[in-house]
Amino acid sequence: MAVRPVLAVGSYLPHAPWPWGVIDQAARVLLPASTTVRAAVSLPNASAQLVRASGVLPADGTRRAVLYLHGGAFLTCGANSHGRLVELLSKFADSPVLVVDYRLIPKHSIGMALDDCHDGYRWLRLLGYEPEQIVLAGDSAGGYLALALAQRLQEVGEEPAALVAISPLLQLAKEHKQAHPNIKTDAMFPARAFDALDALVASAAARNQVDGEPEELYEPLEHITPGLPRTLIHVSGSEVLLHDAQLAAAKLAAAGVPAEVRVWPGQVHDFQVAASMLPEAIRSLRQIGEYIREATG
């Protein structure tokens, strides 16, 4: 695939001013015309987009809602790049979907991104949704944010209906991924990509002061406890993030949290983003939609 060589080159110069923002801007132009409703939402430090596929009722605090946290290694992508995925998710889940355009590294830290995601959740709560009506969902780095947000909410006694993670990056530590057999078969991520991400995440955290100290890096898989939302994970059988998916499922199950991993052979990382071209992506999103509907009654 063409993506892997680009990431390989970028991994040698992670701090160079690569135009990562262009990806989401270009995707906005490429979104096909449809009857899907997309409304801009303002959050305290970020923006969001409320997406409602044709036939889905407005977000009014009834039925269900999905809080979607996009992937992109914490440094790129947004509501536009994930437009088709989110549109189909809204359709199959029969639900409005709030996509948070959280702040990105390297200018901002992962902690700041998580704050923005929390603000998105609060926005849905203020709209009238109860925790048991809200599903947290995300792909790749968005899977990390979804799980970290679920843990933050657990600390204040709120448990969303479910958590859905697509090809999730759930562990910032790179060593186990780089040693995984799939590092040789992953069509997107060379081993050095995780070195580059590690450097960018660490430098962004060092610049963000929390109570007078640099932001600490948070590992969600080190904080798995009973009471987290039931979880569904979809992952490619050949991608290196299969490691994170299987480790998360094992830890969740050990804590008594219902967790299911569905492995898709022959697919690439985050193949659901290509839903306009891949029948398998549509099948995956249909299954996820059914899971969300069942979890929210």
From Swiss-Prot:
Enzyme class: hydrolase
Main subcellular localisation: secreted
One Pfam family this sequence matches: Abhydrolase_3
EC number annotated for this UniProt entry: 3.1.1.-
One GO CC annotation: extracellular region
Temperature dependence per UniProt: Optimum temperature is 40 degrees Celsius (with pNP-butyrate as substrate).
Reaction(s) catalysed (UniProt annotation): a fatty acid ester + H2O = an aliphatic alcohol + a fatty acid + H(+); a butanoate ester + H2O = an aliphatic alcohol + butanoate + H(+); an acetyl ester + H2O = an aliphatic alcohol + acetate + H(+); decanoate ester + H2O = decanoate + an aliphatic alcohol + H(+)
Keywords, alphabetical: Hydrolase, Secreted
Compartments (UniProt record): Secreted
Active site: 140, 239, 269
Effect of residue 269 to A: Complete loss of activity
InterPro entries registered for this protein in UniProt: AB_hydrolase_3 (IPR013094), AB_hydrolase_fold (IPR029058), GDXG_lipolytic_enzyme (IPR050300), Lipase_GDXG_put_SER_AS (IPR033140)
pH-related activity note: Optimum pH is 8.0 (with pNP-butyrate as substrate).
Molecular function per GO: acetylesterase activity; triacylglycerol lipase activity
Induction, per UniProt: Up-regulated in nutritive stress but not in acidic and oxidative stress.
Activity regulation (record text): Inhibited by the ionic detergent SDS and by the serine protease inhibitor PMSF. Inhibited by the FDA approved drugs Diosmin, Acarbose and Ouabain. These drugs remain bound in the active site pocket and could be probable drug candidates to combat TB disease.
Note: Was identified as a drug target.
PANTHER family: AB HYDROLASE SUPERFAMILY PROTEIN C4A8.06C, ACETYL-HYDROLASE LIPR-RELATED
Biological role stated in the UniProt entry: Esterase that shows preference for short chain fatty acids. Contributes to the growth of M.tuberculosis during the nutritive stress. Elicits strong humoral response in both extrapulmonary and relapsed cases of tuberculosis patients.
Assigned protein family: Belongs to the 'GDXG' lipolytic enzyme family.
Name of the protein this chain belongs to: Esterase LipU
Lineage: Bacteria, Bacillati, Actinomycetota, Actinomycetes, Mycobacteriales
